[in-house]
Amino acid sequence: MSTMLWVVVAAVLLFVLPVVRVPMLDLTRRNIIRWQRGGIQKYTTRYYGFFHPYCNAGGGGEKVLWKAVQETLLYDPNCSIVIYTGDVDSSPKEIIANVIKRFDYEMDFNRVQFVFLKYRKWVDGSTWKHLTLVGQAMGSMLLTIEALLRFVPDIWLDTMGYPFGYPVVRWLAGLPVMTYTHYPVISSDMIHKIEIENQKQPSKKGTLKLIYWKLFMKWYQYVGKFVDVAITNSTWTGNHIRSIWKRVKIKVMYPPCSTEKLVKNSSPTAYETRQNQAVLIAQFRPEKRHKLVIQAYSDFISRTASKDHFKLVLIGSTRSEEDRAYVETLKSWAFDTLKIPKESLTFKTDCSYDDIKKFLAESTFGINAMWNEHFGIAVVEYAAAGLISLVHASAGPLLDIIVPWDSAKKQQLPYSDSTKDTRTGLFFKDKSDPDYKPTDAQFNNYGSLADIFEEANSLSIAERKQISERAKECASNKFSDNTFNHAWDHALDELEHKTSRLGSN
């Protein structure tokens, strides 16, 4: 079936579903055949359905998913979990093995079942060559319908960010909806940027694009009406979602970052034994800006040719052949084009969590170069493990993680009190940033990535230890798994209240 036909089908469903209820699904919910490659086993009458089409990706979003699953199983000892995933090329055993390997999470996996979705391509941007935002939104509606036709849970939890399916969940199955949003699908900043571009260079294409995005924003605002409990992962995301879903109470719940384990493995007395080495832990995807890091590292090496410079290790998971090809492209560019010595730069793909902890324990610096990283679990891991974070001055790393810290009072300070004695890392800006303005004062307050590489490399051992200890204290106070567990339990309490209200209607 062609892409356009699917769009037409989804459009029809969008307008028909609110008017024509489908009683078959309510009946199916009571008498559904519990299945999953051999049959979903019936443990209780309460099923929590986690909609996460890429549950095997191994990134920060998946860490949130699996910690939420673990805590939900503890919260309700009689419940079962259903994971809706499009990872049809992996078996349940393989997915579970990856959870243990990547995140070191153990739970009662006998109560975790998988519903495999055949049409995940509908939410893949590459499927929609034109009108990508609308295509993916329509696709998420269709994928939600597929999920509900295969299995109807008692509660719908979206931990990946497909909000356009929420009306479908309510209309078809009457379920309460809880969402954990990592980033907005579209934001007022994005629209404002197009408005400015259109003012500078007016065109019919620009005008149509602006209308298209504003209409899409209206749709995004509308689907928020179907959310019962809304959670965001950071201050930056929370501020944007509040401006979009104005009638919804938004909670900020920092992702689980396992800071307890990392702080425990980091000994202040062993700091001098750390290698002069920087790590970048991020999925191998272009938006993580590996090319910027490699270029900055090349520039940094050229500046410090006669000095000792830290080594760089790029660590990340690969989800597909496209990701693996991207890694090979980076290697060729770094070693063949930029002539970076192979002994200075190392690539590590699909490492186990134990391997990652080893790199964190022996390294001195941690890098995150993504622009507007909505949160940045890897940055928290750097801080908790005692690394000095070298990060982009935006969103989560700037607003939530690498913040001024008072060690005496063990509390975060306002940015106005930021000094060398309270800093927990170093920040940079780059001319390639989408919001770069040469006249903007904030860009003049930060050096380039190569600049902070040089600054970090020249820090004394005493300075490194002080920054490291402040960062560890901050991370362990704000981002522990235990903190997430308590917050998740409170959210489930609220959801219980919503469930009771919906059930009485």
From Swiss-Prot:
Stated family: Belongs to the glycosyltransferase group 1 family.
Protein name listed in UniProt: GDP-Man:Man(3)GlcNAc(2)-PP-Dol alpha-1,2-mannosyltransferase
Superkingdom classification of source: Eukaryota
GO molecular function term, any single one: GDP-Man:Man3GlcNAc2-PP-Dol alpha-1,2-mannosyltransferase activity
Segments traversing the membrane: 5-25
Bilayer disposition of the protein: Single-pass membrane protein
Pathway this chain belongs to: Protein modification; protein glycosylation
Residues on Lumenal side: 1-4
GO CC aspect terms: endoplasmic reticulum membrane
Biological process terms in GO annotation: dolichol-linked oligosaccharide biosynthetic process
Keywords from the named record: Endoplasmic reticulum, Glycosyltransferase, Membrane, Transferase, Transmembrane, Transmembrane helix
